[in-house]
Amino acid sequence: MTTAQFICLSLGSNLGNRFEIFRKAFALLKELEIEDLQSSIILETKALLLPGSPKEWDLPFFNSVLIGKTTLSPKQLLSGVKQIERRLGRDVNALPWSPRVLDIDILLYGDENHQQEDVKIPHERITERPFLLSLIASLCPTRIFHKPGSEYHLKSFGEIAHLLPCPQEMILNSFSPNTLLMGVVNVTDNSISDEGLYLEASKAVAHAEKLFAQGASVIDFGGQATNPKVQQLLNVEQEWSRLEPVLKLLAEKWAGRRQYPDISLDTFYPEIIKRALEIYPIRWINDVSGGSKEMAEIARDANLLLVINHSCSLPPRPDKTLAFTTCASDQLLSWGEKQIEAFVALGLRQDQIIFDPGIGFGTTQIQALNVLHKMKKFRKLGCATLVGHSRKSCFSLLGKYDAKDRDWETVSLSVLLQQQGVNYLRVHDVEANQRVLSAAAWSGVHV
């Protein structure tokens, strides 16, 4: 029986939606006979370029380090990671040092040295990348570096990272690898926390740019407020009059971008999605009504992700809530199982469905906080999970604060949700949540 060997890999990307590329790479690596896969945080760094490189190559890189165990030989592992690179869109004919969708390097393989033409382990530039040394040390600080002839031979990675510190100016940002953020852009005049700020298309798109720069993997545009204070919902034409200018401006300004987030529309009208797809390649439907048959069919045919958000009424009403005699999370789990079964029967793939428990859409404040503490339960659904807890009224149980002043409670719960394996968090303050999540994930997370 072959003994599983410790391995250490690095991932890099500076094209496309880098968060989603990493997420897909994690999944494919687990299929490649790699067990107990753990990721460091993601560090965004300046591109390392040769003098005279084209200006358009100067795109920031996402970098992470992964550790795990495998029975694959070094050559088998190399072959496998190269297949993953190609599968996720890497151009094998691209020039060296040019931007790339995904770069996977084998940094370490057990304590062995492999210095063959096609496999060089430890990686020959490992000590020239201080940000990688820092990430390796975050995962396995006492692991010994084996490379005879190197001045760092037989030193621990904790010590090497101390001797070769990463210059502060090299690191642009740090991000959580396993819990991604959906930034909120309310194109409305009656949202509770930011009413009227982004009604103009130019302001909505500028805010989306800001959220993306702060680390949002997805930007969720909504033209309809669905909070408890709403008296009358907008019809299709009213909602579309708000979203159409935003989508047209996105198509104008973001066409040809080499780094970008996914775009989501927060709507329960299938007609809105049909019209939007003619203007901009949105990737997500965020349906607070829970998803209709028609919406599921659109997602299926256009290969979109569909967020199914549980709700008891729209807008939420205090007399329409989950039952009080049964555990709230159990009720939501049962609803999720039925919805997913129905949508899969329509031909929607399970990996296209994202479950949202609908915090505030039929949960009382106490039920909402209880559900947030039991999100691990929804792993049973076999699909990704998303939570929209940002600035919700349930935090009023903790103190009397205006909605816009509930970010302390939001980020605290974000860490708890990260620890429970929630895949996406829908938040207003992307920067605060991202900084807290990356700090909480410093010593690594399972992916």
Swiss-Prot record:
CDD domains: DHPS, HPPK
Residues engaged in binding Mg(2+): N186
Pathway: Cofactor biosynthesis; tetrahydrofolate biosynthesis; 2-amino-4-hydroxy-6-hydroxymethyl-7,8-dihydropteridine diphosphate from 7,8-dihydroneopterin triphosphate: step 4/4; Cofactor biosynthesis; tetrahydrofolate biosynthesis; 7,8-dihydrofolate from 2-amino-4-hydroxy-6-hydroxymethyl-7,8-dihydropteridine diphosphate and 4-aminobenzoate: step 1/2
Region spans: DHPS: 181-447
Catalytic activity reported: 6-hydroxymethyl-7,8-dihydropterin + ATP = (7,8-dihydropterin-6-yl)methyl diphosphate + AMP + H(+); (7,8-dihydropterin-6-yl)methyl diphosphate + 4-aminobenzoate = 7,8-dihydropteroate + diphosphate
SUPFAM superfamilies for this protein: 6-hydroxymethyl-7,8-dihydropterin pyrophosphokinase, HPPK, Dihydropteroate synthetase-like
One example of a Gene Ontology biological process annotation: folic acid biosynthetic process
Residues annotated as binding (7,8-dihydropterin-6-yl)methyl diphosphate: T226, D266, N286, D356, K392, R426, V427, H428
GO cellular component, one term: cytosol
EC number of this enzyme: 2.7.6.3, 2.5.1.15
A single GO molecular function term of this UniProt record: ATP binding
Domain called Pterin-binding: residue spans: 179-438
Keywords tagged on the record: ATP-binding, Folate biosynthesis, Kinase, Magnesium, Metal-binding, Multifunctional enzyme, Nucleotide-binding, Transferase
Family membership noted in the UniProt record: In the C-terminal section; belongs to the DHPS family.
Name of the featured protein: Folate synthesis bifunctional protein
